[in-house]
A protein has these predicted regions:
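Protein-protein interaction/assembly regions in multi-subunit complexes
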Residues: 1-173
């Protein structure tokens, strides 16, 4: 009869590369166990790490996400997808309303968001849109919310008193 002992890791090496990046080596492992452990670790991290994201967007003079903005290269849906890529940190508050206001030709960057001591933008050079007309002014109001895991906009619980009127676009976070 064959022995049913599993290989047990003899070496666990953790090397910190930066404040947000580390490399963990565990060896030896049975064939296929590396993928199993990696997937489990990824799922746990995605579901339990706290973070901040934009959950609601209102763009001046826009009623829904399928609109276009005259003088802006991207359509509203593309701008919303870019907003979802913002890397934001709310160190002290749970929610925060912020405004982005840009007029004139050129890229609309994350750094164009109004300065707020309660908000830290980790990717300030990220391009959200491109204005192609001198007379175009882009005004975007956003709500940043602190949370944990991934939350679909449809599954988010809304207070019955909240005004989810025309023009307020909800984002997954």
């Amino acid at each position: 009869m064959k022995k049913n002992d599993f290989l047990k890791p003899k070496l666990v090496d953790i090397s910190t590369i930066s404040s947000t990046h580390a490399k963990i080596s565990i060896e030896p492992l049975e064939r296929g166990f590396g993928h199993t452990l990696g997937n489990a670790l990824r799922r746990v991290l995605l579901s339990s790490l706290p973070g901040s994201a934009v959950t609601e967007v209102t763009i001046e003079n826009i009623l829904h996400e399928y609109s276009t903005i005259e003088g802006v290269q991207e359509d509203v849906l593309e701008i919303l997808l870019n907003i979802k890529k913002l890397a934001l940190v709310l160190p002290s508050k749970d929610t925060l309303d912020i405004t982005l206001r840009k007029k004139g030709v050129g890229p609309v960057l994350a750094s164009d968001i109004s300065d707020n001591p309660d908000l830290e933008i980790k990717n300030p050079n990220f391009c959200l849109a491109n204005i192609t007309n001198d007379k175009t002014e882009l005004v975007i109001n956003m709500t940043v919310t602190k949370g944990r895991g991934y939350q679909q906009a449809q599954k988010r619980k809304f207070n019955e008193l909240d005004d989810l009127g025309i023009g307020k676009m909800q984002l997954d976070a």
